[in-house]
A protein has these predicted regions:
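Mixed-charge (Asp/Glu-Lys/Arg
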Residues: 1-38, 45-164
Length: 164
């Protein structure tokens, strides 16, 4: 089924990615709240491990042929320092900085979750770029799959009778 985005799709998909991740964290024993705060979208606390995560969530929809397009995570353009905003918010809420990426295609969606520390250590470009990205090429997906510090969920879409 072809993806035809509405004028409000980016806002809708953003909320959906946050809600889906919140659901899985809650199912995993975390106390979770979605926050409207510059820098992070979710605060999650795991009472058993005493972990408190401040998560920035990036949600994207990719049409057929664009599934491998990287997701922009943190920008440093024109005095905009998204990384500083994440760290400032995590300081305010006493939590560790994490990143989540939700990407949906015509037939499935993937959600990835890892600490910003793990991202920096294993996946962040060593070049001085204006934007940090989460790569979505096949070789990158294999790296994430092999990394125990990257949490991953795949959701399959099946639309039996959905057409307008």
């Amino acid at each position: 089924m072809e993806i035809i985005k509405s004028s409000r799709h980016q806002r809708i998909i953003g909320h959906f990615g946050e809600a889906l991740l919140s659901n899985w964290l809650s199912r995993s024993g975390f106390e979770v709240t979605i926050v409207d705060h510059t820098g992070i979208d979710i605060v999650a606390y795991h009472p058993v491990t005493n972990q408190r995560l401040g998560i920035t969530v990036k949600s994207r929809t990719r049409p057929k042929g664009k599934e491998a397009t990287a997701v922009n995570l943190l920008s440093y353009r024109k005095s905009k320092d998204d990384r500083k905003k994440v760290f400032d918010a995590c300081t305010a809420f006493a939590c560790d900085p994490w990143i989540a990426v939700y990407v949906e295609t015509t037939v499935f969606a993937d959600i990835y979750l890892t600490s910003l520390r793990n991202y920096d250590k294993r996946y962040r470009s060593r070049n001085n770029l204006t934007t940090d990205t989460w790569k979505m090429r096949a070789k990158d997906l294999l790296l994430y799959e092999a990394d125990p510090e990257v949490k991953h969920i795949r959701v399959e879409f099946r639309a039996d009778s959905w057409g307008w």
